[in-house]
């Protein structure tokens, strides 16, 4: 069972003094996380293999003293969930704020309370600036879910807000960031830690192949099946930013948040997306299994969790925009002999879609290609034992389409903007757009 333990308050050596500390223990079947606070924002003091139930947390915390050297701040601290410049932190801060006049706000948070609310919620406050910050942690199998929420008594501008910041608790030697592009997805860039900051940001409003919101910490000898690995994923399909930093003290931190281009309006409450983290001692396969199990049990709708995944065939590369009922029937027959269980009709069946320069948004069957509609093809596909699927791209519109010509104000952005893939994006916040798409797609 997943367990949250609230240890009693105790005394232990943390920096060079004796400090009164709180500690909380979070357990999965294979991992233990110890969270502590010495009066400020909580921090992760331990994250590794599961500890015994009799582990002395005071003794454990006492085994993690900070080192001191010349030319640094006099008080050394662990990297907490949101280190701030107001605390004298000289690395990348976890929060950047300005008041209504653009003046910097340098928060100095004090720990207030920890509550069990669907997990653990840690509250810290800055009474002087009227700020409250909440760090929520919940357990999902072998995956930990982290999220930050900031509240302010007055409107402020948030230049940056990180999900709860995670230190490199496993002393990894390398990290893997994921990049790529179309037809070249999920390329692993395996890099060695070095002092300084690595920033990876998507400013395109989507996750993108170029800047996938994920990270893996590992050692040089970590393989698919053996060795230490920690996987991170920022659960946000829009613009995002990742910052990983090694400070001059040797400390390391991992930050994920929304792209800075999204933080330009005054607000009194803002939350990050959830960040999902899992540690494995069984290599890359271990974190893959943890995330896959989590997605199947808690992300997919319960109605889909145990359904079989049909092997499906997509006809795009076979025909592109040249649709013919005769050809598609022949292709479907070949597909079923190969073991396909679902046949998917891709782009080119609607509007006057003979190439990628027109008709997106005109979700009506092209009678030139399908004079009797799609029924003959669907019936044939079902008859030979396959499900039938069909391709839509409802959020997009072609400038050369009836939809755009009749409703040029339904797009995101200005009318004379640079196109991407010969298309524009519909503003799905507009009720008329929602109604139009629902009507057209449900009719098909």
Model-derived features with residue positions:
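Aromatic- and acidic-residue-enriched carbohydrate-binding clefts of CAZyme catalytic domains
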Residues: 349-377, 401-428
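Active-site-adjacent "subsite" loops/lids of carbohydrate-active enzymes
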Residues: 310, 317, 321, 394-444
């Amino acid at each position: 069972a997943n367990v949250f333990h609230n240890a009693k308050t105790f005394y232990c050596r943390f920096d060079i003094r004796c400090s009164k500390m709180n500690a909380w223990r979070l357990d999965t079947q294979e991992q233990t996380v110890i969270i502590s606070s010495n009066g400020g924002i909580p921090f992760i003091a331990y994250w590794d293999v599961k500890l015994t139930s009799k582990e002395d947390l005071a003794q454990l915390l006492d085994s993690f003293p900070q080192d001191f050297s010349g030319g640094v701040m006099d008080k050394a601290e662990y990297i907490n969930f949101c280190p701030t410049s107001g605390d004298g932190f000289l690395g990348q801060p976890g929060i950047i704020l300005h008041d209504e006049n653009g003046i910097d706000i340098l928060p100095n948070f004090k720990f207030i309370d920890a509550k069990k609310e669907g997990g653990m919620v840690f509250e810290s406050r800055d009474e002087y600036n009227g700020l409250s910050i909440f760090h929520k942690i919940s357990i999902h199998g072998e995956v930990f879910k982290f999220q930050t929420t900031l509240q302010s008594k007055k409107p402020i501008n948030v230049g940056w807000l990180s999900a709860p910041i995670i230190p490199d608790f496993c002393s990894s030697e390398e990290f893997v960031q994921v990049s790529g592009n179309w037809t070249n997805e999920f390329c692993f860039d395996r890099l060695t830690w070095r002092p300084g900051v690595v920033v990876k940001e998507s400013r395109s409003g989507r996750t993108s192949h170029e800047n996938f919101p994920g990270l893996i910490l590992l050692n040089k000898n970590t393989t698919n099946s053996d060795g230490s690995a920690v996987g991170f994923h920022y659960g946000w399909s829009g613009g995002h930013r990742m910052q990983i930093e090694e400070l001059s003290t040797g400390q390391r931190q991992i930050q994920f948040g929304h792209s800075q281009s999204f933080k330009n309006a005054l607000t009194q409450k803002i939350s990050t997306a959830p960040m999902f983290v899992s540690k494995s001692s069984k290599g890359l396969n271990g974190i893959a299994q943890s995330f896959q199990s989590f997605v199947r049990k808690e992300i997919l709708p319960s109605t889909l969790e145990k359904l079989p995944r049909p092997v499906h065939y997509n006809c795009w590369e076979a025909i592109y925009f040249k649709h013919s009922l005769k050809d598609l029937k022949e292709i479907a027959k070949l597909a079923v002999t190969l073991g396909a269980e679902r046949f998917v009709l891709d782009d080119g069946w609607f509007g006057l879609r003979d190439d990628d320069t027109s008709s997106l948004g005109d979700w009506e069957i092209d009678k030139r290609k399908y004079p009797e509609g799609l029924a003959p093809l669907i019936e044939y596909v079902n008859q030979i034992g396959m499900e039938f699927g069909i391709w839509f791209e409802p959020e997009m519109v072609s400038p050369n389409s009836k939809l755009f010509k009749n409703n040029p104000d339904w797009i995101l952005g200005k009318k004379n903007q640079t196109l991407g893939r010969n298309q524009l994006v519909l503003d799905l916040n507009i009720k008329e757009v929602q109604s139009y798409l629902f009507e057209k797609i449900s009719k098909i």
